[in-house]
């Protein structure tokens, strides 16, 4: 089965909005063993829509069309589909009735323009939209079924999960055509990773892909075909073994996701004291539902005074070693852990830039500590001088990795090829 997607809308084509629907759809299909083989974006021009429907229907088996089902003049998907097939638009009585009922239930008078949403190509099969006014439908043209969905994300996602995916699986016996495993890496460049893995003899049907989204490089291991899918687990394990410490998570998008998964409902507690990361670690963890089950507190102790008064850092330590030092960050972590007797505490203090660096401690110098009930681990790293935002993101990632390694019973402090570490 050959699956394609056509995204519509001038705002998408012009880059005025990010097409999150397409990314979500492709990922969902991959999770179900189905690969999207082509994606096309078209503006709100009738002739362009007609042309792309006709052209792609000659090559694909099923096409998911997203957008253009609203009531306004620039919503042209139904009209374009009818024209592409050489048939008329007709009012779907069932959907027209549902539109009137919807507005009545909400105590509103239905604008005349909304009846447009009930006009479908003559041969169309209505596809239910249980949460909106845009009527979905599917039409057979040439070799392809074209499946039309609204652009509103929550309507689109529900229709795909409840209508499109079951239709595809039933009609095309789809599934288990492709599988994907992901390895998240930290502290090594994309080209270096590729050079390391180039010598591997991969089984037929297995290919590698790389995605850089700092501070991580994601290695994607694709398997196409039954035999390749069977070998996928062993190949992924071999890659992870080759790369060693740089692999920090399997099938996760970030280290904060990995830490959340490990700590959520685990009975383990965490406190965080942040200076240069400015609440980033806490914010990232709070972004996950359920983080209250393990996150005791997040303290942004930016000034020296707050480090002393809130965390109990010794003024003498600050005078002798400075805010960006192993000694200070260790006291920060110990103080944060002690407040609520947390199992663990992370602390960061550094120079994110663009100013504030010295010859001894240039921009990108960051001290990070992990306090446990049995002691404290710490390191001071020199990050590549990039943006202030990037220094904060890499610092957070290294802090998460220290905690991850402690949870795994591994060495907490390890070398990263792209991150220098100061000697203690």
Curated annotation (Swiss-Prot):
Alphabetical list of SUPFAM superfamilies matching this protein: CinA-like (SSF142433), Molybdenum cofactor biosynthesis proteins (SSF53218)
Alphabetical list of InterPro entries matching this protein: CinA, CinA-like_C, CinA_C, Competence-induced_CinA, MoaB/Mog-like_dom_sf, MoaB/Mog_dom
CDD domains from the UniProt entry: cinA (cd00885)
Pfam families xrefs: CinA, MoCF_biosynth
Disulfide bonds listed in the record: none
Similarity-based family: Belongs to the CinA family.
Matching NCBIfam families: cinA_nterm, molyb_syn, PncC_domain
Protein name per its UniProtKB record: CinA-like protein
Higher taxonomy: Bacteria, Pseudomonadati, Pseudomonadota, Gammaproteobacteria, Alteromonadales
């Amino acid at each position: 089965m050959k699956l394609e997607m056509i995204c519509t809308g001038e705002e998408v084509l012009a880059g005025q909005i990010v097409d999150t629907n397409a990314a979500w759809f492709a990922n969902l299909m991959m999770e179900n063993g189905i690969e999207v083989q082509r994606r096309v974006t078209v503006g709100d021009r009738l002739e362009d829509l007609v042309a792309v429907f006709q052209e792609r229907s000659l090559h694909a088996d099923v096409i998911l069309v997203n957008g253009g089902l609203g009531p306004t003049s620039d919503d042209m998907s139904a009209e374009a589909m009818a024209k592409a097939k050489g048939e008329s638009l007709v009012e779907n009585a069932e959907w027209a009735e549902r539109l009137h009922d919807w507005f009545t239930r909400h105590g509103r008078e239905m604008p005349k323009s909304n009846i447009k949403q009930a006009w479908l190509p003559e041969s169309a099969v209505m596809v239910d939209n249980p949460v909106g006014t845009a009527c979905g439908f599917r039409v057979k043209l040439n070799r392809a079924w074209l499946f039309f969905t609204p652009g509103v994300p929550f309507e689109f996602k529900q229709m795909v999960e409840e209508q499109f995916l079951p239709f595809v699986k039933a009609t095309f016996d789809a599934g288990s055509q492709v599988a994907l495993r992901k390895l998240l890496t930290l502290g090594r460049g994309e080209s270096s990773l590729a050079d390391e893995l180039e010598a591997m003899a991969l089984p037929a049907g297995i290919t590698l892909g790389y995605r850089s989204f700092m501070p991580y490089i994601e290695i994607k291991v694709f398997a196409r075909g039954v035999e390749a899918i069977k070998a996928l687990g062993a190949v992924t394990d071999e890659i992870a073994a080759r790369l060693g410490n740089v692999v920090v998570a399997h099938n996760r998008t970030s280290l904060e996701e990995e830490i959340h998964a490990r700590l959520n409902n685990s009975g383990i507690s965490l406190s965080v004291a942040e200076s240069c990361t400015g609440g980033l670690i806490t914010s990232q963890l709070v972004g996950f539902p359920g983080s209250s089950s393990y996150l005791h507190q997040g303290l942004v102790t930016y000034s020296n005074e707050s480090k002393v008064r809130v965390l109990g850092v010794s003024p003498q330590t600050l005078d002798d070693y400075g805010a960006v030092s192993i000694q200070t960050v260790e006291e920060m972590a110990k103080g944060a852990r002690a407040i609520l007797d947390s199992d663990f505490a992370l602390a960061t203090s550094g120079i994110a830039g663009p100013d504030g660096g010295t010859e001894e401690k240039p921009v990108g110098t960051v001290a990070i500590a992990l306090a446990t009930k049995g002691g404290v681990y710490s390191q001071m790293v020199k990050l590549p001088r990039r943006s202030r935002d990037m220094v904060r993101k890499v610092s957070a990632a290294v802090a998460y990795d220290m905690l991850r390694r402690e949870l795994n019973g591994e060495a907490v402090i390890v070398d990263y090829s792209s991150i220098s570490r100061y000697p203690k």
